From Swiss-Prot:
This is tRNA pseudouridine synthase A. The active site is at D53 (nucleophile). CDD domains: PseudoU_synth_EcTruA. GO terms for biological process: tRNA pseudouridine synthesis. Homodimer. Its EC number is 5.4.99.12. Belongs to the tRNA pseudouridine synthase TruA family. The gene is truA. Formation of pseudouridine at positions 38, 39 and 40 in the anticodon stem and loop of transfer RNAs.
């Protein structure tokens, strides 16, 4: 069976058109494929756990590629070091493992965790400005937290799925939707079994309406019931969003073990 290299990737999405290759645009996927071609001498297809949009970041994107018959592709740690030596400063391979199983970055995933960061300051601090959204109005965090609990569980999230995409189903399960406040930053932690296009940003947009007092917390129940995205608020901007973690079942739990104790980034 062909071996696969599995990568855990962090990136700052500011300068990119998203994960997926697009003509006449710079994508994370294309940068990785270009670097792999430099190492191997031929193009290698890289498959991720999911596509992040333009401007969206990642702390724990997962991607894999089939391991070519090449001397540089025998040791995952060496692959990690070579990639990090050649990648731009805003893309880092956090970890790399080799597997000979049926693992697939997308289809083997059982859960994902996204985090959206809000700044409560009218002007974010310089080192936060590329990674958080400042709504510039006062937010009632307690009301937002109350509203968030209405979305936890299995629901039809059609009202939170952007138009223009075809879905086999808009039913998803949210395991967690919590707000964590620390000093002047609020992090919306959203963990579920899968997400529709712009679903997290649309949820955050709805929570912002609750937080500024436009609607009561129970309004999210009405949104679920309408199943109509056109009646929802605008999406929150992409730059506050990050793909934090992707979960896999045994025996593919390498990065669950490494998430908190991987002190070396291989660069």
């Amino acid at each position: 069976m062909t071996k696969k290299i599995v990568l855990q990737i962090a990136y700052q999405g500011t300068s990119y058109s998203g994960w997926q290759y697009q003509p006449n645009a710079l994508s994370i996927q294309e940068v990785l494929k270009t670097i792999l071609k430099k190492i191997a001498g031929f193009r290698i297809s890289v498959i991720s756990s999911g596509r992040t949009d333009a401007g969206v970041h990642a702390q724990g994107q997962i991607a894999h590629f089939h391991c070519p018959d090449h001397p540089h592709f025998t040791d995952p740690r060496q692959i990690q070091k070579m990639l990090n030596a050649l990648l731009p400063h805003d893309i880092v391979i956090r970890d790399a493992v080799m597997t000979d199983g049926d693992f697939h970055s997308r289809f083997s995933a059982i859960a994902k965790e996204y985090r959206y960061t809000l700044s409560l300051l009218p002007k974010p601090l310089p080192h936060h400005r590329l990674f958080c959204f400042s709504p510039r109005y006062k937010l009632n965090i307690a009301r937002m937290q109350e509203a968030a609990q209405y979305l936890v569980g299995t629901h039809d999230f059609a009202s939170f799925a952007n138009l223009g995409r075809e879905y086999s189903s808009t039913i998803r399960t949210l395991y967690t939707l919590d707000l964590s406040e620390q000093e002047h930053l609020v992090t919306v932690i959203c963990r579920g079994n899968g997400f529709l296009y712009k679903m997290v940003r649309n949820i955050v947009g709805a929570l912002l309406d609750i937080g500024k007092g436009k609607y009561p917390p129970e309004h999210l129940l009405d949104m679920l019931a309408t199943k109509d995205r056109r009646k929802g608020p605008p999406s929150a901007p992409p730059y506050g969003l990050s793909l934090h973690h992707v979960c896999y079942p045994p025996p593919y739990q390498w990065f669950c073990k490494h998430e908190h104790n991987n002190s070396s980034e291989g660069k």
